[in-house]
Regions:
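A short, Lys/Arg-rich alpha-helix, primarily the initiator
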Residues: 1-21
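Short, charged recognition helix plus adjacent turn
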Residues: 2-3, 11, 27, 35, ...
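Alpha-helical residues within the helix-turn-helix
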Residues: 13, 24, 52
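Short alpha-helical DNA-recognition segment
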Residues: 16-35
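Residues that mark the N-terminal boundary/hinge immediately upstream of a DNA-recognition element
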Residues: 18, 43-46, 57
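Short, basic-rich loop-to-helix N-cap that marks the start of a DNA-contacting helix
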Residues: 39-52
Length: 69
């Protein structure tokens, strides 16, 4: 299972991107922001945007956790 290694919204906020600014500037939509808040995986396009805004690689924000089924 993939999960976030960092608090995405907090890191974006530290860079000056509040959830309001993300929506207003049409960088990330409300539905994707809600997914991130709920710990759900955002879309590939949203992950691309996050990596661009944070100047990072996907591996910096995501990690794989093995779950026994």
């Amino acid at each position: 299972m993939l999960r976030y290694k960092i608090d995405i919204l907090e890191q974006l906020k530290e860079k000056g991107y509040t959830s309001y600014k993300l929506r207003k500037d049409k960088l990330i939509g409300e539905a994707q922001i809600q997914k991130i808040r709920n710990g759900e995986l955002a879309s590939k396009e949203t992950l691309n945007t996050i990596c661009k805004l944070l100047s990072c690689q996907p591996g910096d924000i995501l990690e794989y956790i093995e779950i026994d089924e």
